[in-house]
């Protein structure tokens, strides 16, 4: 089944390990590119999306520490675009090198992507997405003097973290550009970190203080470009029920209805596996094709043996 249009969503944590240096992240992405090129070898049309959770948190911390009246910190939408550019550069450089090594006549290109959200989304009244580092309570009081608009919540006894809105994506502004790149034998890298969050004001798109979940944004892109397959990569080869319990069970071929029942049983952790499963359900329900949740190292096994968690109607 070659020549399929396949969106592959990479997690931000797959890019950043314990070493947050640019060199270490580039090295990690070179290994990622070696795994992804197997899809290209099978004559599939690859579209890469990625997270930026650790990276944008680190960048916002740098911005805050260095902020002055004459050189103020950049807002979240701009920080997201900055990480889209940096991670996209690393990813396309790694992909181009691997494609060259394999003798494949293709190249990669990064698209800084604006993802539209609804200005009336209830998420704007209920910030819930944690970003950045953990703080002690006394540190929060100092930060609030400089940024009274920031909202911090306690996170499971580990300290306090800033939370921001995480609205659902309703459109990907550049999806036609991305489709055009695919049609011209280019591997697009887009929707980095869920894309730059924008809201519509009349005929204009305006950046907003939010972070869009990259799995939902990847699904919206896959839907708009009429992808045949959405692959959401995570740390494990399969989705599990009763995860990390003696009776844990991996899911291999599963229907949307079965997954929805598992969601009702609270089988999937919020902020971890749950959004991946929900994004996969959305894609399949929209009649686009199948969705797969698996790990990067399992890509070859998925291609050859169909292993991983495969979601169908």
Curated annotation (Swiss-Prot):
Gene3D superfamilies: Acetylglutamate kinase-like (3.40.1160.10)
Catalytic activity: hydrogencarbonate + NH4(+) + ATP = carbamoyl phosphate + ADP + H2O + H(+)
Protein's UniProt keywords contain DNA repair: no
GO molecular function: ATP binding; carbamate kinase activity
Iron found in the keyword field: no
Pathway per the UniProt entry: Metabolic intermediate metabolism; carbamoyl phosphate degradation; CO(2) and NH(3) from carbamoyl phosphate: step 1/1
Annotated EC: 2.7.2.2
UniProt xrefs under InterPro entries: AceGlu_kinase-like_sf (IPR036393), Asp/Glu/Uridylate_kinase (IPR001048), Carb_kinase (IPR003964)
Locations listed in the record: Cytoplasm
Pfam families per the UniProt record, alphabetical: AA_kinase
Chain coiled-coil ranges: none
Biological process, per Gene Ontology: arginine deiminase pathway
SUPFAM superfamilies linked to this entry: Carbamate kinase-like
Keywords: Arginine metabolism, ATP-binding, Cytoplasm, Kinase, Nucleotide-binding, Transferase
GO CC, any one term: cytosol
NCBIfam families: arcC (TIGR00746), PRK12352.1 (NF009007)
Similarity remark: Belongs to the carbamate kinase family.
Name under which the protein is recorded: Carbamate kinase
Organism field: Oenococcus oeni (Leuconostoc oenos)
Organismal lineage: Bacteria, Bacillati, Bacillota, Bacilli, Lactobacillales
Gene: arcC
């Amino acid at each position: 089944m070659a020549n399929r249009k396949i969106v592959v969503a990479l997690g931000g944590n797959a890019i950043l390990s314990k070493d947050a240096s640019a060199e270490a992240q580039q090295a990690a992405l070179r290994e990622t590119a070696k795994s992804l090129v197997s899809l290209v070898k099978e004559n599939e049309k690859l579209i890469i999306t990625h997270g930026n959770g650790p990276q944008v948190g680190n960048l916002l911390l740098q911005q805050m520490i260095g902020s002055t009246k004459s050189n103020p910190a950049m807002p979240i939408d701009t920080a997201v675009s900055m990480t889209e550019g940096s991670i996209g550069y690393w990813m396309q450089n790694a992909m181009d090198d691997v494609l060259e090594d394999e003798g494949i006549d293709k190249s990669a290109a990064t698209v800084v992507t604006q993802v539209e959200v609804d200005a009336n989304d209830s998420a704007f009244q209920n910030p819930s997405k944690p970003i950045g580092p953990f703080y002690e309570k006394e540190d929060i009081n100092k930060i609030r003097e400089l940024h009274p608009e920031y909202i911090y919540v306690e996170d499971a006894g580990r300290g306090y973290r800033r939370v921001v809105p995480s609205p659902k994506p309703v459109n990907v502004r550049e999806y036609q550009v991305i489709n055009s790149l695919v049609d011209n034998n280019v591997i697009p890298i887009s929707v980095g970190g869920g894309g730059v969050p924008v809201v519509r004001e009349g005929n204009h798109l305006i950046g907003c203080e939010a972070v869009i979940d990259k799995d939902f944004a990847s699904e919206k892109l896959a839907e708009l470009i009429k992808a045949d397959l959405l692959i959401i990569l995570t740390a494990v080869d399969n989705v599990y029920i009763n995860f990390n319990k003696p009776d844990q069970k991996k899911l291999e071929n599963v229907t949307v209805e079965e997954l929805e029942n598992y969601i009702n049983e609270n089988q999937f952790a919020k902020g971890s596996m749950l959004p991946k499963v929900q994004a996969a359900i959305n894609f399949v329900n929209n009649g686009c094709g199948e969705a797969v949740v698996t790990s990067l190292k399992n890509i070859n096994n998925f291609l050859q043996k169909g292993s991983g968690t495969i979601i169908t109607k």
